[in-house]
Amino acid sequence: MANTQLDHLHYTTEFTRNDLLIICKKFNLMLMDEDIISLLAIFIKMCLWLWKQFLKRGSKCSETSELLEKVKLQLAFTAYKYVDICFPEQMAYSRYIRWYIH
């Protein structure tokens, strides 16, 4: 699943506003305002920290670029759905969005 726009995400667990916009563009997601972007960033950073702790504890998983990309994109998807569920009044328009993550 090569995508040069996402290559720089392989090597860091820090997400910037631009990283989130790239991910949302990849999945045709729309973000409404800065508050939602900030919430996504906090949620994703928390999940990635937990994932790093899991790997450090001697998991047999290898920390490859492909694995990290898959995990990060799945977390972005999860975070977006989380916001959709918790803030339906802000995200009601997202009901028509199709999801492409397998």
Swiss-Prot record:
GO terms for cellular component: membrane. Its main location: membrane. It is found in: Membrane. It is a single-pass membrane protein. The chain crosses the membrane at residues 36-55. Keywords: Membrane, Transmembrane, Transmembrane helix. It comes from the Eukaryota. This is Putative uncharacterized protein C6orf50. It comes from Homo sapiens (Human).
